[in-house]
Amino acid sequence: MCTDTPCSGSTGSGPTPSRRALLGAALAAPVAPLVLSAPPTWAGIERPRLLVFSRTTGFRHMSIETAVATITDLGAAHGFDVDATEDPTAFTHRGLDAYDAIAFVNTTGDVLEGAQRTALKRFVRRGGGWAGVHSAADTEYSNPFYTRLLAGGRFLAHPLEQPGLMVTESATHRSTRHLPEQWLIPIEEFYSFTSSVRGRSRVLLSIDESSYLQDPNTSNPPTGPENPFPTYPGVSGVMGDHPMAWTHRVGRGRSWYTALGHEITMYYDDRFTQHLLGGLVTVLKHGRKHRSRSYLTLSVEGRPRR
C-alpha cells in the first residue's frame, strides 16, 4: 500500500500486495473464493475514481492493508480506479477534484488539519461521495463537519470480538439487497455508538443485541489483573436501537458508513465484500453525477473561483 502519496492501484501494478498474500497465516480455515455481482453499469460516464485514506493517529487495525487491497481488487473488477494514501496533504481543493468519492478505511484519531478539513468539507458539500469503514467512526472527534458525515453516530465502545446477528433493514439498497433478512457473522468487533442515527439517516443494517454481549466493553471493563481493556468511565454498550450501516445526504454530497470491517476475515466474506462494494458504488455514482467542480470555473478576471 502507498502511504506517502496517492498511488493508483486500479491497474494491478505497484506495491499494493494481493489480498491472498496479506492473509498469510491469519486464517486457519479455508475461505470461499470471492464471488460478487456483475460489475455496475456506469452508463457511459468516465471511469470513476476513488481515494482511499487509511491514516491512523490512534489504534491501528491489522486489517488495514487487507482492506485497502480488497478495495483495489474491487475497483479493478468493477470499473473504478483506486488511489490509496495515508498522506493528509492529499486533501487540497485541487487534489480532491480528481476524485468522485473518498473512503476513510479504519482511520483513527485526528487525521486532518485545518485546511485539509476545509477541503474535505467543500468536496462533500459540492456533491462528492464519502464512505466510512469501521473505525472511521473513531476519527476526527474535534471536527464538527466530520460528525455530520457520520450522522452523529460516533463510536462509544465495543466488547471483545464474538459472533453477532445482523438484521438487514433495506432489501433495496445496493449495499444490502444481496443479504438475507438475518446474517450471522462468526467473529467481528461490534461497535456501540453515542446515539442511534435512525431519523437522521437511512438505516441499512442493524444488530440484534440479544445475539451478543455488549458488556463488559472498552468503557465498562472487568476488574482484575487480566483486564483486557483500558480504563475509561464505565458506560453500557447497550443501545436498544443499534444501527450498524447507514447512508444520508450531506449538502449536495452523499455519505455511507458501515461499522463492520475490523477483522481480516471480514474481507474474505462474500457478504461483506458485496456490502462494501455496494457502499462504494453508491458514493461513486453520486459523486460522478452530482459533484461540482465550480471552483475551477474561471471568473471574469480569469482567476479560479474559490
Q: Predicted regions: what is each one?
A:
Residues 1-17, 28-34:
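N-terminal secretory signal peptides
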Residues 14-23, 38-39:
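Twin-arginine (Tat) signal peptide motif
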Residues 33-46:
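C-terminal region of N-terminal signal peptides and the immediate post-cleavage residues
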Residues 44-48, 54, 62-65, 69, ...:
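Extracellular ligand-binding/catalytic regions of CAZymes and related secreted enzymes
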Residues 45-46, 156-251:
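Catalytic beta-strand/loop cores that center a nucleophilic Ser/Cys/Thr
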Residues 52, 59-140:
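Helical hinge/lid and interdomain linker segments adjacent to catalytic or ligand-binding clefts
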Residues 57-58, 109, 137-138, 208-212, ...:
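Short, solvent-exposed loop/turn segments at secondary-structure junctions
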Residues 110-182:
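A glycine-rich, often tryptophan-bearing local segment used as a flexible ligand/cofactor-contacting loop or short
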